[in-house]
Amino acid sequence: MMMSNLKLGVDVIGAHNLFPKDGQGTSNAYVELYFDGQKHRTTIKDRDLNPVWNESFFFNISDPSRLHYLNLEAQAYSHNRSTNGRSFLGKVSLSGTSFVPHSDAVVLHFPMERRGIFSRVRGELGLKVYITDEASLKSSAASNDHPDNLDPALPRAMNVEHRSDKRHVFYNLPNSAQEHQHQHPQGPNQSSSLAAEQDNHNEHHHHYVPKHQVDEMRSEPARPSKLVHAHSIASAQPADFALKETSPHLGGGRVVGGRVIHKDKTATSTYDLVERMYFLYVRVVKARELPIMDITGSVDPFVEVRVGNYKGITRHFEKRQHPEWNQVFAFAKERMQASVLEVVVKDKDLLKDDYVGFVRFDINDVPLRVPPDSPLAPQWYRLEDKKGEKIKGELMLAVWIGTQADEAFSDAWHSDAAMPVDCSPAISAVLRSKVYHAPRLWYVRVNVIEAQDLIPTDKTRFPDVYVKAQLGNQVMKTRPCQARTLGAVWNEDFLFVVAEPFEDHLVLTVEDRVAPGKDEIVGRTYIPLNTVEKRADDHMIHARWYNLERPVIVDVDQLKREKFSMRIHLRVCLEGGYHVLDESTHYSSDLRPSARPLWRQPIGVLELGILNAVGLHPMKTREGRGTSDTFCVGKYGQKWVRTRTMVDNLCPKYNEQYTWEVFDPATVLTVGVFDNGQLGEKGNRDVKIGKIRIRLSTLETGRIYTHSYPLLVLHPTGVKKMGELHMAVRFTCISFANMLYQYSKPLLPKMHYVRPFSVMQQDMLRHQAVNIVAARLGRAEPPLRKEIIEFMSDTDSHLWSMRKSKANFFRMMTVFSGVIAVGKWFSDICSWRNPITTVLVHVLFLMLVCLPELILPTMFLYMFLIGLWNYRFRPRYPPHMNTKISQAEAVHPDELDEEFDTFPTTRNPDMVRLRYDRLRSVAGRIQTVIGDLATQGERFQALLSWRDPRATAIFVILCFIAAIVFFITPIQIVVALAGFFTMRHPRFRHRLPSVPVNFFRRLPARTDSML
């Protein structure tokens, strides 16, 4: 057997800020690499704490199937030439799950790790680790030694022998965004080696590869839905808008209290979050030797599949006796009223289609097939005429009964999603379910430094030049700079958003502002993005000079006279250490950086079952009655899912299940319901019906949440309930320790804190990211249109709304309500409203003053007990949109009209003037509050500023006296006296302000300096 060509490449770039080990403040550093029993080492860099190697090494991978379980270890040492010994400088360990292909690899600087408790290490090691399968590359074992740098005491690279009796299979690296595909369970055509690998590591992947099995389901009446109310009275809302807990019968059994009651303990199913639905599948593959039907000597065949009143039609071919369709039709068994399936071959004609032949099946004899059973092999069937006699021509078909777990489900034509009038392939395409993968987004940073040897068209004046950078439809410009020496300096940064694969070019144009409104192009350069360097941290990118090309052809003699060409100095890189925000930061579903090597292992699996919808409002009129053609869209991370469109149905049943990998619990799943606008006239927009958000950190792991979610939408006339969506959600944890560790990590990648963006930059980049995702998903089939992407991504969440401002104010008041309640309680204590309570507080206060070491233990013990007590009343349901918190119940109609106004406004001037005056009134109150806060702060500053010499003198003298008193008097006595004085009896109080308050209010502020 031949060995696999798969190799692990390691580029040792350099190290930074190493620990000195030679006693003279330096180190003789080198690096040893260990992987899969192989060992390589770099050259020795003498007397250098920041060595640079730029050396590449390649390791043979003996068994690619075990790649994820191997580790790469890089150990740095300092060589002592006097003793032929070595000192440990630090190590870096990388797991096999972080290895990526060469195209995705970037240079990462890893902090040095200790080998033991007493190891003294510091600094970073720069590595670039990747996987390649180029056969021309050889292992570095034979060529890695450097005789001039090796010392006899140092070990050389070891040659590793590989057994040739073991079969090696090449494995493509898995894409984490594709490990859980919608409704495509593993078929029997997978390689035996992969099956063996799954068997060997079943305990690590039991969440990913469950088995399919058919089990019977009783049609018992479902339990009545149970209303779920919030535990807070302040956030209570109408019962019609509340969440309803349900106990449906799903594929795995009945759900009661978030747990599944299995009827058959041995029965398991991947699709256990939806009701099992049975379909009659008909795969029309091809036909042969069809009889001639036209006078032209040919036939224009198409196939019509009929079950009772349901009919599916394939596309037709012109003049072909051996057509191939390979189309699948799915008929919902619960709606079938016939017992016979007819597959009819017809000849397309202008007036009336001609009858060619048919094949008839008894549905009771159709076999049942559920994955992981092998796909049913199609067979040839002889056509019959209307009399039942065999005729010339055969049709290849496969007919079986399956569930929504079948591989053919997503691409099939569905009877419950069929148009009553138009059943063309184009219409059928926009009705199917689909899984989309959004492109991986990157930030492109362009640093425009300077330009030299600029040659303007008018040499009688100094050019006033600026640089225009363009990437797709994103355009940015530098400030104008007057080039007095035929050179200009800007040193400005631009940021763009780009999606993989990098097909666009970065275009930089140097333009001369000849006159106001008139610019002339001086030079231009094109930079392909696939040649731009990627970086995952903030290390410096080397700047490069790029030649500027003239936009027009000039005189050849002039080109010969010009000795130098125009150049521009740029620093361009792809930022992989950031997460490109393409959705609202409050509802982010993915927080991973762009660079794949920085991704951590998934901590869990999110499963979503979209069951059905009830009580939907009609969104259109068809044949004189209201109806809807609805579908659902789910978004989490880079994976978008779309259910099939249920045509002409106000209570549709979807029963489709989807799965996502979870990398961070502080993320949000978003599910939207839409009305398909592509079934009528072209150019119609898909209409939004409602949206649901579920934050994963609020879910208990392993629990199945089955609820009916109200679809609440805010209209210009007020909040409306558009129906209810019944869903089942389960969050399964793979590694509980990793999930808890995730709570200690920053929410966003490191670069967001090292080199943060401004708020304006974030809004602009987010807008560009949404446009890129919408353009990419809009090219899929069926497309996810732009209005869907914008609605799911909350692109308008930053726009002004009086309703949202009120809601945020009351939210803030709710947050501080506890502090206000404590202040009110303490005021009652000080006023001796309840003497017994006040005396007890005095005793407790005296105990804490005498024993201050009990303050922190008492406080934390109190919070511990309160937390245990509240566990009994913990929420048992996912949070949902609350109309009372959103201030959507009693909102003024004019405020709603303002919220739905476009940007810029399209309302009449009188309405805009009225709203402007109202906004001025609100802003005036805010201005007053901010001014009062500033005044209090300036009075504190005036205590020691001698702005009021008498007040400052009094304060300084009091501070000196207080210092003497606090030095002489024990602090317990001072605190006790202050506490007793604060809680003194009302008989010893008066209503006038105290002396310190009077003194503070007399201090000057800068209000006198305001215009």
From Swiss-Prot:
Compartments reported by the entry: Membrane; Vesicle; Endosome membrane
Co-factor requirement: Ca(2+)
Keyword annotations: Calcium, Endosome, Glycosyltransferase, Membrane, Metal-binding, Oxidoreductase, Repeat, Transferase, Transmembrane, Transmembrane helix
Molecular functions per Gene Ontology: glycosyltransferase activity; metal ion binding; oxidoreductase activity
Residues engaged in binding Ca(2+) 1: 294, 300, 347, 349
Gene3D superfamilies: C2 domain (2.60.40.150)
Tissue expression summary: Accumulates specifically in hydathodes. Restricted the basal meristem of roots. Observed in flowers.
PROSITE patterns: C2
TM stretches of this protein: 812-832, 846-866, 954-974
Location of region: Disordered: 178-201
Residues involved in Ca(2+) 2 binding: 294, 347, 349, 354
Domain C2 intervals: 1-110, 261-381, 421-546, 587-709
Protein topology in the membrane: Multi-pass membrane protein
Biased composition (Polar residues): 178-195
Cellular-component GO terms for this entry: endosome membrane; vesicle
Protein name (database record): Multiple C2 domain and transmembrane region protein 7
Organism of provenance: Arabidopsis thaliana (Mouse-ear cress)
Gene name tied to this protein: MCTP7
